């Protein structure tokens, strides 16, 4: 019997596969009704903010040859409604499923408020801190690009929550290791990486960017080598477990990410082509491991053999 069980802070996973935040809503998208979410390792919900947000101007999504460019924004009904209208029914339907909530905001106080409310709800097992949000107090620069800001934000959140926190790193930085180390220093229990890579595409007929917001986050196949490289770098320089993401679309990809240093993975853009990709990947993982002669998936973590 092949072991796919993974134990992470706050998350007891039957397998390492979960949907990436924003790609499965609050467990209420049509695809989530096509299978039992207990078939996944965990459920990660859409980023939640203090008040309701409506997202960015249309068009918000552009499908490219090798990925997806999106500027959806953090559309959500606000933390109080997320708890009462989304998390309560999700937890009622899935009492034993590990649930990770994603936290966002425009200020440190926003993050602290949302994190505390979600932690106090007793409905989630862990929090993912989305530090790619623009920091209004710093002129709109992402929270996640300054190590000192990440460290301070992590500390403030840790002070008010009772569940483990995973800091989600943006790849749009010069030195991602410094950001990961800052999260570790601030008391993070884990790292989640990578978020989308900033990009833009242009319609040559109109000469306008294809997204209403002009720029957006690139995800999918195109970012996979970037994600693998960054995960490997961070794994070698911090002691925290890593949830890896960035272009995963197969069980073989899961193995690649784990060899680079991820202990678990999140599937996002693959759901555009296959609405239940995360389930299909989780289901096919044991056979892929057997093909490679691997009895315990935990033995893969960080075991890439460098040339």
Swiss-Prot record:
Keyword Ribonucleoprotein in annotation: no
Record keywords, A-Z: Cytoplasm, Flavoprotein, FMN, Oxidoreductase, Pyrimidine biosynthesis
Name of this protein: Dihydroorotate dehydrogenase A (fumarate)
List of catalytic residues: 133 (nucleophile)
Known cofactor(s): FMN
GO biological process, alphabetically ordered: 'de novo' pyrimidine nucleobase biosynthetic process; 'de novo' UMP biosynthetic process
Listed pathway(s): Pyrimidine metabolism; UMP biosynthesis via de novo pathway
Source organism superkingdom: Bacteria
Cysteine pairs bridged by disulfides in the record: none
Keyword Metal-binding on entry: no
Reactions mediated catalytically: (S)-dihydroorotate + fumarate = orotate + succinate
PROSITE patterns, alphabetized: DHODEHASE_2
Cofactor note: Binds 1 FMN per subunit.
Pfam families associated with the record: DHO_dh
Family: Belongs to the dihydroorotate dehydrogenase family. Type 1 subfamily.
HAMAP family for this protein: DHO_dh_type1
């Amino acid at each position: 019997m092949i072991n796919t069980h993974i134990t992470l802070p706050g998350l007891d996973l039957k397998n390492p596969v979960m949907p990436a935040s924003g790609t499965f809503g609050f467990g209420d998208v049509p695809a989530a009704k096509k299978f039992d979410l207990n078939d996944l390792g965990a459920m990660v919900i859409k980023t939640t903010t203090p008040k309701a947000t409506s997202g960015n101007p249309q068009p918000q999504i552009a499908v490219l040859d090798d990925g997806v460019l999106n500027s959806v924004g953090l559309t959500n009904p606000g933390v109080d409604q997320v708890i009462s209208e989304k998390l309560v029914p999700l937890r009622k339907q899935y009492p034993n499923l590990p649930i990770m909530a994603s936290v966002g905001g425009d200020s440190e106080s926003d993050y602290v408020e949302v994190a505390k409310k979600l932690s106090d709800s007793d409905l989630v097992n862990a929090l993912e801190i989305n530090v790619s949000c623009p920091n209004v107090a710093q002129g709109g620069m992402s929270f996640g690009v300054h190590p000192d800001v990440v460290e301070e934000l992590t500390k403030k959140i840790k002070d008010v929550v009772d569940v483990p926190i995973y800091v989600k790193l943006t790849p749009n930085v010069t030195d991602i290791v410094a950001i990961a180390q800052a999260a570790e220093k601030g008391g993070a229990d884990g790292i989640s990486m990578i978020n989308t890579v900033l990009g833009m595409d242009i319609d040559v007929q109109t000469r306008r960017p294809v997204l209403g917001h002009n720029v957006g986050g690139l995800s999918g196949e195109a970012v996979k080598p970037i994600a693998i490289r960054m995960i490997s770098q961070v794994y070698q320089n911090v002691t925290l477990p890593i949830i890896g993401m960035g272009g995963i679309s197969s069980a073989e990809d899961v193995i690649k990410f784990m060899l680079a240093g991820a202990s678990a993975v999140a599937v996002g853009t693959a759901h555009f082509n296959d609405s239940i990709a995360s389930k299909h990947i989780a289901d096919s993982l044991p056979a892929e491991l057997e093909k490679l002669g691997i009895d315990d998936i935990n033995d893969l973590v960080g075991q890439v053999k460098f040339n």
